[in-house]
């Protein structure tokens, strides 16, 4: 009996579970307007139809919804009305599609082996898939089936699995050449994928709109085209010939792509839109970069361990992917086995897909002919040969002067982590025509480096230029710098550099700052070029000149004289040229490599360079390596031991001692920005001994050192032309021979030597290269003691040699992170003369910063350039402001003044030969020869005009970059015709919203150079007046705000809320000119108003406005305040703001883009009589007396427009400097009061995602037509109430106007901030329903409540009636009831 009872109980439980499961089948075409509900363990089967149209919500529990040609249960069950090979599914006008179970769509009959004319369109507002969503399409071998599928909800949240498959009639995967298209998302939609997408078979999947989340995407024989600017958190797996193609611009993040390789099942590939230029691969990090000829670089993480020789790149017209676009394709020729990435030193493989090089030849200018006067007096062959010889010799000599530009660095970061740092350095090489050109070496240092620790990233090198020269470049060093939380670091000089080629064509390369918070790496230089001046040190001129001189002068001179003259000219020219050129040998600057472990420095290696001579006598570069051993922890300062080694042995007496490395303590939560300005010394023409000393500083003070860079010194005594050969020809009388020899030897040789030396020295002196300035900052704890800036200029010592003078500018502190002060500055100048060159140690500047502050190093330098006539140039570089930033993180950009005084030595550069030339030679020969040499030298030298590299100043706020100012240089000509340097300033604003460009030309022959910036798109005027007066003591503040908004007559409901906050904080600048103010005198005035508008049923309801006034002084409604000051201080502010917001039009039209226009007029005035001389101020300010003071008036007129459509914005930074008299007993009668006025208008938009809790779906109205904000989720119950419901998109617009006035001398500031926040809800779909309360309950779903997951809530169940001919529902309820009765009886 017990076993029987147990059996019956089990049967009862089973019957209960069967009773919970419902199976419904619906056959034929369907147009469903009611919600589709599938409960748990239930099956709803739509089959046998060709057209399905759904226009209401879907709610699928843990059951199955099937829509297809054949039944879910049987392949042989279909409807007689089914249209063969046709299937159309439309899900539209649906708010929510929620799938927690299984949703299958099948557009073909199984085993039919037929193509289907199919279209699947899924357009719900919100699609949330937490289960499995699967589309099965059919493919036929040998035929092209081209169904279309679009899955484009406004908001797509995939927490489950999404499948799209193409199958044959046998159920296998179709992998034919005909690709089926499916679109996921649209440009205006939002997609979040948190689990799995899988495309199987011949599919072209087009991904549109922003995609985010954390998921896997499997491409099994499919192609995926990504046309999105946001594609984050997705890992793409290439399987069986799958391909990833990007048709959008490069992404900010690196996409992870697995499976690139070739196998038996297909070749996988990665492709980007455009034509290929080059690609690089780093085996240690697994990052590959594809660069197109359009200048776009795409980065992908493909994994480590690839063999670089197996990569294949090609350009595809798009035919392989059935696309009209061109693609740069990367494949791998063998299977790939995944390997673990390890950060270690390894070379980066680099390949130029298309080699493009442009070079221009200036042979026509460098080989200029001799003057016509010489041609007329000399034989034509002599004139041409002399011109050719001079040009050839000059060109050969000048080629060794090829100047290699300094390297530059580009750092990419994400948040507080550094992705990679790319260092591009340059070297000299030769192209196929034999021109000397610049090659580049790119070194990439991979991260990430978090801001909480110091890591030593791997360094690797790639070369982007291939040449036949035997120049090898190794990896460049990387100096890691520790930075700490709550700080931002802005690198100083990631800029653009330019350098001339041998034919003096300008080469420019650019570097763009990509990140807003980066750790600057020190600038390092990889010198791999060896200058061989052997061609210019030949003992004689080219043979063509000697033979031409001998043959062509024989007609006018005896043969012996011809040969002697040829020999003398050759020897003199060569000796003078060699002597002059050798002194221009350019020594590269040193570089530093620091190795660290955690927070400790292991050692620092400094490599410096000097000039020496190899065994053949060629002038080469030697290196001196100095190692400073550690460790140096960041909590203390230690003086490391040092050792020095020299890698080149020479005969010259060059002594070098170790260079110093001073480390500065950095506290936690601080940031350090290195300054890497280094100076190197140059040898003299005879390579006299060079001495360098080192200074070791053991305290937390960075020692500054004066560095002298001496240029070439030309000594013509040793380079005088040798006398004519003693064996004068016997054909002439001995007396004539000896006389002519003696005369020509002493006169011609000395004249040629003197003239050449004078011309060469005059020309070469203008090539004197002035080193860039450098900065040394001393700090104590979190305070900066002082900052010393050493800049350089050109001067002359007592023997007349051109040397380098230094100018030292000291900016005194301290500057703490709680305030910004304007330090006083003092300047001293030091000049070192004589030919012996002394060089002190090279500085390594570290800067310590305090918590919540950022420091930007001031390394903006300008070097001078020679004029066209190569006269002496003097320039000085003075840094005018310190780059210390307060907690507001608004960086002050430093200004650099480069003033140059140009001395015109045209009379001396073209000096004629001495008058004591032999009378036997034509008189025109001496003048012509002198003129020819000067002309040729001038023509050759002019192209060596050196353009300084540009520099960049970046202002940041927190982790955001406000703007970046790039100052670049170009060559121009002043009014006297001198070649000078002009500057171009380009300002890049955040998000490239607005940019302005200005040009500045440095005028010559002026003691001071003014800098003028013309900014467009801004209408701002400032007027300042000063007069002595005394007023009655009053203080008022007037604020007027006028706002208006208009709405069209429609049934669209709009919420417009505005909040304005205007007040003064701290002390008023203009009211403190002569009045003491304490904290008790400071009040705050706040005006707050809110407005809301709504429309009634007919759309003509007038607006209602609610305004509140709080904390406004005084209590009267006149909006007048007497808060600041007790007497005789007046400050007024009138702000008039008008706004118009056309946000919606009549029903059926798209809403208009919100616009904003404003006008601001501000007037502030302050005046007062003689103040009290007693002590005042609780903040420690000492008392002072002002017998008289001026009235300062400031008027600011601003007119700006902001339009969201094309992101227009105006931004103004204004400074006003006024002078007021003081008492007679004060030392400085004209103390300057610096006033800084800043105005800015910013706005932002935020399209609220309806899936987030902040979204609003509908607006229920009460009986009187007003919105019930306290009960959003309660539908109206009154029959007469109007209910308006649409598909809404919420847009938030924030506008902030800020006017700040500060007095940095007296620590006074006044600030007016007006903030407008608009939240507008507009009707995107214009779906409007107006019903009474009775029918509302049946036709309108309840308003969903926000949840952490979505706004989609279960709908009340709606019964689905079975159509005629449909399968019956399983009936188990009677059985269950019968068993239950038996159990009860037992």
Swiss-Prot record:
Q: Which UniProt keywords apply?
A: Cell adhesion, Cell wall, Disulfide bond, Glycoprotein, Secreted, Signal
Q: State the disulfide connectivity.
A: 115-145, 144-178, 304-341
Main location group: secreted
Single biological process term from Gene Ontology:
cell adhesion
Does the keyword Repeat belong to this entry? no
Where does the record locate the signal sequence feature?
1-19
Region (Disordered) location: 429-507, 530-553, 612-690, 714-739, 795-873, 1000-1032, 1140-1186, 1198-1227, 1241-1269
Q: Name one GO molecular function term.
A: cell adhesion mediator activity
Cellular component annotations (GO), alphabetically ordered: extracellular region; fungal-type cell wall
The answer to keyword Nucleotide-binding applying to this record is: no
Query: Where does it live in the cell?
Result: Secreted, Cell wall
The Polar residues compositionally biased stretches are: 1140-1150, 1159-1177, 1198-1218, 1241-1259
| Task performed by this protein | May play a role in cell adhesion.
| Protein name, entry field | Adhesin AWP3b
Organism, as annotated? Candida glabrata (strain ATCC 2001 / BCRC 20586 / JCM 3761 / NBRC 0622 / NRRL Y-65 / CBS 138) (Yeast)
Task: Give the source lineage, highest ranks first.
Answer: Eukaryota, Fungi, Dikarya, Ascomycota, Saccharomycotina
Please state the gene responsible for encoding this protein. Answer: AWP3b
């Amino acid at each position: 009996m017990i076993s029987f009872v147990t059996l019956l109980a089990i049967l009862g439980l089973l019957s209960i579970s069967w009773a919970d499961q419902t199976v419904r089948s619906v056959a034929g075409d369907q147009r469903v307007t009611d919600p589709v509900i599938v409960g748990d363990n239930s099956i709803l089967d739509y089959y046998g139809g060709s057209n399905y149209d759904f226009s209401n919500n879907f709610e699928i529990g843990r059951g199955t919804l099937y829509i297809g040609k054949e039944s879910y249960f049987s392949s042989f069950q279909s409807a007689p009305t089914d249209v063969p090979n046709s299937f159309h599914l439309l899900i539209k006008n649906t708010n929510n599609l929620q799938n927690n179970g299984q949703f299958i769509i099948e557009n073909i009959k199984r085993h039919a082996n037929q193509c289907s004319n199919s279209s699947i369109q899924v357009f719900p507002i919100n699609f949330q898939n937490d289960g499995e969503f699967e589309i099965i399409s059919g493919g036929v071998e040998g035929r092209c089936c081209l169904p279309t599928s679009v899955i484009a909800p406004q908001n797509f949240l995939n927490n489950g699995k999404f499948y799209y498959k193409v199958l044959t009639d046998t159920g296998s995967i179709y992998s034919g050449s005909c690709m089926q298209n499916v679109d996921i998302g649209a440009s205006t939609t939002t997609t979040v994928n948190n689990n799995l997408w899988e495309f199987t078979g011949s599919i072209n999947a087009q991904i549109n709109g922003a995609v985010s989340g954390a998921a896997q995407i499997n491409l099994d024989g499919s192609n995926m085209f990504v046309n999105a600017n946001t594609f984050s958190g997705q890992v793409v797996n290439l399987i069986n010939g799958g391909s990833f193609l990007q048709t959008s611009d490069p992404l900010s993040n690196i996409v992870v792509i697995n499976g690139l390789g070739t196998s038996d099942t297909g070749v996988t590939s990665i492709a980007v839109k455009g034509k290929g230029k080059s690609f690089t691969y780093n085996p240690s990090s697994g990052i590959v970069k594809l660069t197109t000829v359009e200048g776009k670089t795409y980065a992908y993480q493909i994994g480590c361990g690839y063999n670089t020789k197996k990569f294949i790149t090609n350009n595809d017209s798009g035919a392989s992917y059935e696309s009209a676009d061109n693609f740069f394709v990367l494949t791998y020729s063998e299977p790939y086995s995944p390997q673990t990435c390890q950060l270690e030193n390894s070379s980066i493989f680099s390949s130029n897909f298309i080699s493009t090089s442009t070079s221009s030849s200036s042979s026509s200018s460098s080989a200029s002919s001799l003057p016509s006067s010489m041609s007329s007096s000399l034989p034509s062959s002599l004139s041409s040969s002399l011109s050719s010889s001079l040009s050839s010799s000059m060109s050969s000599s000048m080629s060794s002067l090829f100047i290699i530009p300094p390297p530059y660095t580009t750092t990419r970061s994400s948040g507080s982590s550094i992705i990679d740092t790319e260092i591009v350095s340059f070297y000299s090489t030769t192209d196929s025509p034999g021109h000397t050109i610049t090659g580049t070496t790119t070194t990439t240092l991979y991260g990430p480096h978090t801001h909480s620790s110091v890591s030593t990233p791997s360094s690797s090198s790639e070369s982007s230029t291939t040449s036949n020269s035997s120049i090898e470049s190794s990896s460049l060093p990387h100096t890691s710098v520790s930075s700490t939380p709550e700080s931002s670091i802005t690198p100083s000089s990631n800029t653009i550099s330019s350098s001339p080629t041998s034919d003096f064509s300008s080469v420019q390369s650019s570097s763009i700052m990509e990140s807003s918070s980066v750790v600057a790496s020190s600038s390092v230089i990889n010198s791999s070029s060896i200058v061989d001046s052997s061609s210019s040190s030949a003992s004689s001129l080219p043979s063509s000149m000697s033979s031409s001189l001998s043959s062509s002068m024989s007609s006018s001179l005896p043969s012996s004289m011809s040969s002697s003259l040829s020999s003398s000219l050759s020897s003199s020219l060569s000796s003078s040229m060699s002597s002059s050129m050798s002194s221009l040998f350019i020594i590269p600057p040193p570089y530093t490599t620091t190795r660290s472990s955690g927070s400790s420095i292991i050692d620092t290696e400094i490599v410096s360079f000097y000039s020496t001579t190899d065994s053949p006598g060629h002038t080469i570069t030697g290196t001196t390596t100095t190692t400073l051993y550690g460790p140096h922890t960041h909590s203390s300062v230690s003086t490391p031991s040092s050792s020095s080694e020299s890698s080149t042995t020479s005969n010259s007496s060059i002594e070098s001692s170790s260079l110093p490395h001073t480390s500065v303590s950095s506290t936690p939560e601080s940031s350090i920005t290195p300054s890497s300005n280094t100076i190197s010394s140059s040898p003299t023409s005879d390579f006299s001994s060079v001495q360098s000393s080192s200074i070791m500083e053991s305290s937390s003070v960075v020692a500054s050192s004066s560095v002298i860079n001496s240029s070439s010194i030309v000594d013509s005594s040793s380079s005088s032309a040798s006398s004519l050969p003693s064996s004068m020809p016997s054909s002439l009388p001995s007396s004539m021979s000896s006389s002519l020899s003696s005369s020509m030897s002493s006169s011609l040789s000395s004249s040629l030597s003197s003239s050449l030396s004078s011309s060469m020295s005059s020309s070469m002196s203008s090539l004197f290269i002035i080193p860039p300035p450098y900065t040394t900052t001393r700090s104590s704890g979190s305070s900066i003691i002082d900052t010393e800036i050493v800049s350089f200029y050109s001067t002359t010592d007592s023997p007349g040699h051109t040397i380098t003078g230094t100018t030292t500018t000291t900016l005194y502190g301290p500057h703490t992170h709680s305030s910004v002060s304007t330090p006083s500055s003092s300047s001293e100048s030091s000049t070192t003369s004589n030919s012996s060159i002394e060089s002190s140690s090279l500085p390594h500047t570290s800067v310590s910063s305090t918590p919540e502050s950022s420091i930007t190093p001031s390394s903006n330098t300008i070097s001078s350039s020679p004029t066209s006539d190569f006269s002496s140039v003097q320039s000085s570089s003075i840094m005018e402001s310190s780059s210390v930033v307060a907690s507001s993180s608004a960086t002050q950009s430093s200004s650099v003044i480069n003033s140059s005084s140009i001395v015109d030595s045209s009379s001396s550069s073209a000096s004629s030969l001495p008058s004591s030339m032999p009378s036997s030679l034509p008189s025109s020969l001496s003048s012509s020869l002198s003129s020819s040499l000067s002309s040729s030298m001038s023509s050759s030298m002019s192209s060596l005009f050196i353009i300084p590299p540009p520099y960049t100043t970046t202002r940041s706020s927190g982790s955001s970059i406000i703007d970046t100012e790039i100052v670049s240089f170009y060559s121009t000509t002043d009014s006297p015709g001198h070649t000078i340097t002009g500057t171009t300033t380009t300002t890049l604003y955040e998000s490239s919203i607005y940019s302005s460009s200005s040009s500045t030309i440095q005028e010559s022959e002026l003691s001071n150079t003014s800098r003028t910036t013309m900014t467009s798109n801004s209408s701002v005027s400032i007027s300042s007046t000063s007069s002595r007066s005394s007023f009655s003591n009053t203080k008022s503040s007037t604020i007027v705000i006028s706002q208006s908004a208009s709405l069209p007559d429609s049934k669209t409901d709009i919420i417009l809320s505005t909040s304005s906050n205007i007040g003064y904080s701290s002390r008023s600048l203009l009211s403190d000119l002569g009045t003491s103010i304490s904290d008790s005198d400071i009040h705050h005035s706040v005006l707050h108003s809110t407005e809301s508008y709504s429309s009634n049923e007919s759309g003509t309801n007038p607006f209602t406005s609610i305004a509140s006034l709080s904390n406004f002084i005084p209590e009267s409604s006149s909006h007048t305040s007497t808060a600041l000051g007790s007497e005789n201080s007046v400050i007024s502010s009138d702000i008039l703001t008008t706004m118009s917001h056309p946000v919606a039009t009549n029903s059926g039209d798209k809403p208009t883009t919100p616009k904003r226009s404003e006008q601001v007029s501000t007037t502030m005035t302050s005046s007062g009589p003689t103040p009290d001389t007693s002590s005042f101020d609780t903040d420690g300010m000492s008392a002072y007396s002002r017998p008289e003071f001026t009235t300062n008036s400031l008027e600011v007129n601003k007119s700006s427009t902001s339009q969201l459509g094309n992101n227009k914005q105006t931004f103004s930074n204004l400074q006003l400097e006024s002078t007021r008299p003081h008492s007679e007993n004060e030392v400085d009668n004209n103390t300057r009061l610096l006033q800084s006025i800043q105005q800015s208008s910013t706005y932002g938009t935020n399209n609220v995602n309806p899936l987030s809790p902040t979204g609003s779906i509908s607006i229920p109205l009460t009986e009187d037509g007003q919105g019930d904000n306290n009960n959003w989720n309660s539908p109206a119950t009154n029959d007469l109430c109007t209910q308006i419901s649409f598909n809404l998109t919420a847009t938030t617009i924030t506008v902030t106007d800020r006017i700040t006035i500060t007095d940095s001398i007296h620590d006074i500031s006044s600030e007016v901030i007006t903030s407008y926040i608009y939240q507008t809800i507009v009707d995107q779909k214009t779906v409007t329903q107006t019903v009474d309360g009775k029918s509302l309950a049946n036709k309108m779903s309840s308003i969903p409540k926000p949840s952490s997951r979505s706004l989609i809530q279960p709908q009340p169940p709606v019964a689905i009636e079975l159509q005629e001919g449909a399968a019956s529902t399983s009936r188990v309820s009677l059985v269950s009831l019968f068993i239950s009765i038996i159990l009860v009886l037992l």
